[in-house]
């Protein structure tokens, strides 16, 4: 299992590095939008959306990411500073800081698929735009942020394997 994970990670890393350093700004924005669409498809599956509705939702979020990034200027090289992203990032930060802790503590159930779809928008669109934005600032900066996340994830995995007695989030893992 670990060997397959490592091989998969190396193949994906090679593709990511090629895209990160070789694609023009618009190509990277398209790449980030595709990542957003794939994540939206996964979110829709967790919500119980089936077949066409899952693909439509994923397509809408991917297109919205591409359109928002283009309007913000993320499709151009670094000569133009992106604008209009602060409110998007602020809404996301407020959601994570003010809503998510209470949501998890109270174990709130989503009121319906429509509300869950809107929450997916708040969960998926800002990070996708941030990936495009950080790459515009510096591919090395984005790679550093991603590496920090990867290192933390790998450390948590091995720490859990070595010292974990019970799962902290059995509903997730």
Residue ranges and their predicted role:
Residues 2-173:
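Membrane-embedded alpha-helical bundles of polytopic integral membrane proteins
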